UniProtKB/Swiss-Prot annotation:
Residues 1-29 are annotated as: Disordered. One of its GO terms (biological process) is response to herbicide. Confers an increase in glyphosate resistance when expressed in E.coli. It comes from the Bacteria. Keywords: Herbicide resistance. PG2982 is able to utilize glyphosate and other phosphonate compounds as a sole phosphorus source; it can grow in over 100 mM glyphosate. The keyword Zinc does not apply. This is Increased glyphosate resistance protein. Residues 1-18 have a biased composition (Basic and acidic residues).
């Protein structure tokens, strides 16, 4: 009897929720109704009913074993503004113990609902939530290619790319080629901007600056006006009038010294008198290393090949199998038969 009363009261609450005639759930002029229904006849069915949004108030409402709607309505809080759709979930226990509960009505909000299908839900922005659409769980790092240049970054993070930061042995990195030409033409040292370093600020960089790539860069100072005097001894000798030519061939300075174009316009002030080592033939010397060489691959021609005593298996013919098959059958050997010298002579003559 108590169960029937409970089921009857629950059915009334469900009807009041579905038809919108309840006192505490009457929609106002600014209230929007989201219509969604779902029913799966399983052991623990799930039914989703529409929820009324009171202004900017959002709160998930869940019915477990037919909880009174008035109690759940009291749990609505007006805290936060997010973009989402809140559904009233009704868990129906279809086991043997609760089969006496009333069935779910075939209409929700006076609209015929197919209990075996999931209807479409409406997603709309709430009023006053234009500034905050999604709540950021964490600030994205610049290494994930989706960060913001104005977001505060860690000192070890690079600038908007997945890459390895330069080592900490030098605080600055050489500027780009246009900046070096600017320093060379104007005669100003240290006026060029530097790339974002671990000790620098990623925001205060030039617009044309490139971020650190995915390989570790050389972070030596880019002003080669004073550095080039020390590295002059490793450049081509002074007898080469044209810089970048060696043995009448173009030396790949752009591949070896691509980090600085200032070396292309620099002349040698003196001959270091360093003799190269003649270790191998046709070896080239790099412009920035003294003993770094490269070996070439050449064709080899074979002449006057003499074969001395080839192996029996390497004789010309159909193969080693043919040599065995062409042998005559072995005669009987032993007392009363062919002697050993005659047998060996016959074998040799057959070959």
């Amino acid at each position: 009897m108590h169960r029937e009363d409970d089921s009857t009261s629950t059915g009334r609450r469900e009807e009041r929720l579905s038809t919108g005639k309840g006192d505490s759930l009457q929609p106002g002029p600014d209230q929007r109704i989201f219509q969604t229904a779902l029913y799966r006849p399983q052991r623990h069915g799930l039914i989703l009913f529409p929820q009324r949004l009171y202004g900017n108030c959002l709160a998930p409402l869940a019915y477990s074993n037919y909880v009174a709607p008035r109690e759940l309505h009291s749990s609505i809080h007006a805290e936060g503004r997010t973009l989402s759709v809140r559904l009233i979930m009704l868990f129906v226990n279809t086991s043997k113990r609760s089969r006496t509960l009333p069935p779910v009505g075939s209409t929700v909000m006076r609209i015929l609902v197919n209990l075996c299908q999931l209807l479409s839900a409406e997603f709309q922005l709430l009023q006053g939530s234009q500034r905050l659409i999604f709540k950021l769980c964490y600030r994205t790092c610049p290494d994930q290619r989706r960060g913001d240049t104005r977001v505060a970054q860690c000192p070890g993070d690079s600038h908007l790319s997945q890459c390895l930061t330069a080592t900490f042995r030098n605080g600055v990195q050489r500027p780009d080629a246009p900046q070096q030409l600017f320093v060379l033409c104007t005669g100003l040292q240290g006026a060029a901007l530097i790339r974002p370093r671990p000790f620098g600020d990623s925001v205060q960089i030039a617009g044309g600056q490139q971020s650190l790539s995915q390989r570790r860069k050389d972070n030596a100072a880019g002003s080669d006006l004073a550095k080039g005097i020390e590295q002059a001894i490793f450049d081509p000798a002074i007898e080469h009038v044209v810089i970048g030519l060696m043995n009448e061939k173009r030396n790949p300075l752009f591949l070896q010294d691509r980090g600085s174009l200032l070396r292309q316009f620099r002349r040698i002030a003196g001959n270091p008198h360093i003799k190269r080592l003649a270790l191998t033939v046709q070896m080239r010397e790099r412009s920035h290393r003294l003993f770094q060489r490269r070996g070439g691959v050449h064709t080899v021609r074979i002449e006057d090949v003499d074969i001395v005593e080839p192996h029996p298996l390497q004789r010309p013919g159909r193969g080693w199998r043919s040599g065995i098959c062409d042998l005559p059958p072995m005669p009987p050997y032993g007392p009363g038969h062919m002697s050993q010298p005659a047998f060996e002579e016959m074998i040799i003559s057959s070959r």
